[in-house]
C-alpha cells in the first residue's frame, strides 16, 4: 500500500513539474502540500477528505486546528506548515505593495487589506503607516476583539505614529458578519483618531471596512472625513 501511495505522490509531482502548477486540481494541489500519507490513506485521499469536510481551499486555509485534525492522518505539523504557507503569501503581497514608490494604487491597497483581514473570526483593527511621500513604512494589526466589536484607542495609534515617524496612515478593520457598511461607531472612532493625529501633524488618509466580498471606504462615502 505504501508503495502505491509513494507512486501516486511522484505522479502528482511529475505532473506539476511537467505541466505547471496550474494544471493541478485543488485536491491535487493540496495533496502535493500534504506530501505524504500513512499506511491507510494516501496524500490524495487525505486531501479529498479534508476538502470534502471543509468545502474549499479558502475554508481549509482559515480552519482552526481542531477542524483540521478531525481528518485522521492530519495533525499539528501539517497545520503549522499550512499556516506558515498562508503567512508567506500574505508577506509576499505586502512586498508587492511596498514596491509602489507612492501608495497611489487604491485597488491594490484594498486587495491587500481585504486578503489580510477578511477571514479573521474576530474583529481586527489594523493600520498602514506611511511616510510623507505615502510610501509604506509598516503594516500592523493593533487591536483585536470579539466577533462583532473591537475596542480601539487613539492614543496607542498616535504613539506608534511617533515611534515610526509616520506622516500618514490608512486604517482598516474587518466585519466578521461579512457586511462592509460602516457603523456609527466606526464613523465616531474614525473622527476621534483623525483629530488625535492632527495634534501630531499626521494625516489620516482613509479608514477601510472589510466585508466578505466588498470594501467600504469611510472617506469616500463620508466627505466630512476629508476636511
UniProtKB/Swiss-Prot annotation:
One of its GO terms (biological process) is proteolysis. A motif (JAMM motif) lies at residues 173-186. Keywords: Hydrolase, Metal-binding, Metalloprotease, Protease, Zinc. Pfam families: RadC, UPF0758_N. InterPro entries: MPN, RadC_JAB, RuvA_2-like, UPF0758, UPF0758_CS, UPF0758_N. Residues 102-225 form the MPN domain. The keyword Membrane does not apply. Zn(2+) binds at residues 173, 175, 186. One of its GO terms (molecular function) is metallopeptidase activity. Belongs to the UPF0758 family. NCBIfam families: PRK00024.1, radc. This is UPF0758 protein lpl2409. It comes from Legionella pneumophila (strain Lens).
Amino acid at each position: 500500500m505504501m508503495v502505491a501511495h509513494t507512486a501516486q505522490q511522484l505522479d502528482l509531482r511529475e505532473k506539476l513539474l511537467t505541466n505547471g502548477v496550474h494544471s493541478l486540481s485543488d485536491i491535487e494541489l493540496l495533496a502535493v502540500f500534504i506530501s505524504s500519507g500513512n499506511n491507510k490513506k494516501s496524500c490524495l485521499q487525505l486531501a479529498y477528505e479534508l476538502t470534502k469536510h471543509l468545502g474549499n481551499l479558502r475554508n481549509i486555509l482559515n480552519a482552526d486546528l481542531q477542524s483540521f485534525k478531525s481528518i485522521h492522518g492530519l495533525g499539528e505539523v501539517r497545520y503549522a506548515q499550512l499556516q506558515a504557507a498562508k503567512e508567506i503569501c500574505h508577506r509576499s503581497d505586502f512586498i508587492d505593495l511596498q514596491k509602489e514608490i507612492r501608495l497611489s494604487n487604491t485597488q491594490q491597497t484594498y486587495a491587500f487589506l481585504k486578503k489580510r483581514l477578511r477571514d479573521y473570526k474576530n474583529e481586527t483593527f489594523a493600520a498602514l503607516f506611511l511616510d510623507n511621500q505615502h510610501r509604506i513604512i509598516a503594516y500592523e494589526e493593533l487591536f483585536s476583539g470579539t466577533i462583532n466589536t473591537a475596542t480601539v484607542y487613539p492614543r496607542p495609534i498616535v504613539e506608534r505614529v511617533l515611534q515610526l515617524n509616520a506622516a500618514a496612515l490608512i486604517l482598516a478593520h474587518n466585519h466578521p458578519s461579512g457586511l462592509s457598511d460602516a457603523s456609527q461607531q466606526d464613523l465616531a472612532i474614525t473622527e476621534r483618531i483623525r483629530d488625535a493625529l492632527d495634534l501630531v501633524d499626521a494625516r489620516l488618509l482613509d479608514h477601510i471596512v472589510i466585508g466578505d466580498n466588498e470594501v467600504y471606504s469611510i472617506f469616500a462615502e463620508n466627505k466630512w472625513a476629508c476636511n
